[in-house]
C-alpha cells in the first residue's frame, strides 16, 4: 500500500508540475518588438534600457520616427519611439504622410523633450537664426528629421535653404567641422544634454542660439507637436544662461491591437523604474503631466487604465 501511495503521490506531483509549467508558459507575455532608431542614438539607448528592465521587450534598430510609424502600421513592430511632430503628421495624414494616414497607433507616454539646438562658436557674429543667411550651416543628414526641423526654423525668420550654404552631415561630423572652422553653425534636435554637444564644449567654446518669442510662437502655432522649452544654464560647459528654444517630444507609442494589460504594465514601468532609466538617460521624464499633455494622438486604453489608477484623468480620446 505504501508503495502504491508513493507512486500515486509521484504521479500527482508530476502532473502538477506539468500543469504549472503549462500555465506559466501561457502566462508569460509574448515578445514586444520596440522600434527605436540608429544604434548609438538616444532612441536606441532608451529602448535598450527598457529591454534590460523587461526581458520581454526586444529593441529593434530602425531608421527612426518615420520608419517606426510605418512599421507599426504594417504590424512589423508592437511599439515605437517617435517625434511628436512626426506622430502628428502620421495620424492626421499630412506632411510626409499626406495620403497615407495611420490609424492603428496609440500614445503611451512622452519620454523626454528633444530640444532644437543651433550651435555656433562662442566668438561668432551669429546671434540669431536670421544671421545664418549666407553662412555655411549643417542641417543634418539629407531627408532626416532634423533637416526638416531646421527648414521650419529658417522659414520662421524668412529664410530658406537657398539663402544659406547647406551642408548635410551627421551630428558627429558637424561638430568636427565646426571645431575645425569649415562650417559656421549646425542644427541638433536631441535631448539636452546630449553627448555630441557636451564633448564639443570640452574642446571649444560654444554658444546656443536662443529663439525669440515671435519665432517660438510661429513654430508652436503653425506646427502640431512643437513645444516651447528651455535649455537650462549649466547644461553644457560655457552655457551660463538659460536658452529659450522649441522642441518636440519623444513619444512612446503602441499598436492599437496591443494587449491592454501589457501596455498598462509598460506605462507603469516607465514611472516606477524611472530611477533606473535615469542612470542611462539623465533627462528621462518622470512627470505624468508632461507624459500626457498635448500629445497629438489618442491614448492606448492600457495607458489610460494606468494613468487613471494614479489619479491622472485622461481618456482614450485625449489628444491635441
Predicted regions and their residues:
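Bacterial N-terminal signal peptides that target proteins for export
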Residues: 2-13
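C-terminal motif of bacterial Sec signal peptides marking the signal peptidase cleavage site
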Residues: 22-25
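Bilobed "Venus flytrap"/periplasmic-binding protein-like clamshell domains
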Residues: 29-57, 114-180, 293, 297-302, ...
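Extracytoplasmic small-molecule ligand-binding "clamshell" domains
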Residues: 42-73, 78-79, 239-240
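Acidic, polar ligand-binding/catalytic clefts
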Residues: 74-113, 123-125, 191-196
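Pocket-lining segment of extracytoplasmic ligand-binding domains
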Residues: 84-86, 94-96, 124, 161-252
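Ligand-binding clefts/hinges and TM-proximal coupling segments of bilobed small-molecule sensing domains
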Residues: 135-152, 223-298
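An extracytoplasmic/periplasmic, membrane-proximal ligand-sensing/linker region
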Residues: 169, 173, 179-180, 190-208, ...
Amino acid at each position: 500500500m505504501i508503495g502504491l501511495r508513493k507512486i500515486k503521490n509521484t504521479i500527482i506531483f508530476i502532473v502538477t508540475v506539468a500543469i504549472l509549467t503549462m500555465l506559466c508558459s501561457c502566462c508569460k507575455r509574448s515578445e514586444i518588438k520596440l522600434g527605436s532608431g540608429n544604434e548609438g542614438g538616444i532612441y536606441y539607448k532608451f529602448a535598450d534600457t527598457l529591454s534590460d528592465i523587461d526581458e520581454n521587450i526586444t529593441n529593434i534598430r530602425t531608421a527612426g520616427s518615420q520608419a517606426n510609424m510605418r512599421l507599426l502600421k504594417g504590424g512589423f513592430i508592437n511599439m515605437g519611439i517617435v517625434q511628436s511632430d512626426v506622430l502628428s503628421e502620421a495620424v492626421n495624414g499630412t506632411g510626409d504622410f499626406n495620403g497615407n494616414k495611420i490609424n492603428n497607433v496609440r500614445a503611451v507616454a512622452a519620454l523626454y523633450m528633444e530640444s532644437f539646438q543651433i550651435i555656433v562658436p562662442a566668438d561668432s557674429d551669429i546671434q540669431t537664426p536670421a544671421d545664418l543667411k549666407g553662412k555655411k550651416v549643417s542641417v543634418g543628414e539629407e531627408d532626416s528629421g532634423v533637416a526638416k526641423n531646421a527648414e521650419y526654423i529658417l522659414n520662421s525668420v524668412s529664410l530658406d535653404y537657398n539663402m544659406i550654404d547647406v551642408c548635410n552631415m551627421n551630428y558627429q561630423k558637424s561638430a568636427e567641422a565646426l571645431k575645425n572652422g569649415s562650417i559656421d553653425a549646425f542644427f541638433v534636435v536631441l535631448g539636452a544634454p546630449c553627448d555630441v554637444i557636451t564633448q564639443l564644449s570640452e574642446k571649444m567654446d560654444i554658444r546656443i542660439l536662443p529663439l525669440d518669442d515671435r519665432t517660438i510662437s510661429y513654430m508652436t502655432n503653425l506646427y502640431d507637436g512643437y513645444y516651447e522649452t528651455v535649455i537650462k544654464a549649466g547644461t553644457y560647459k560655457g552655457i551660463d544662461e538659460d536658452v529659450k528654444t522649441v522642441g518636440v517630444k519623444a513619444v512612446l507609442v503602441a499598436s492599437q491591437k496591443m494587449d491592454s494589460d501589457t501596455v498598462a504594465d509598460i506605462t507603469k514601468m516607465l514611472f516606477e523604474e524611472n530611477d533606473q532609466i535615469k542612470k542611462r538617460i539623465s533627462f528621462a521624464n518622470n512627470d505624468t503631466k508632461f507624459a500626457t499633455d498635448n500629445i497629438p494622438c489618442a491614448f492606448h486604453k492600457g495607458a489610460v487604465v494606468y494613468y487613471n489608477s494614479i489619479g491622472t484623468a485622461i481618456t482614450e480620446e485625449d489628444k491635441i
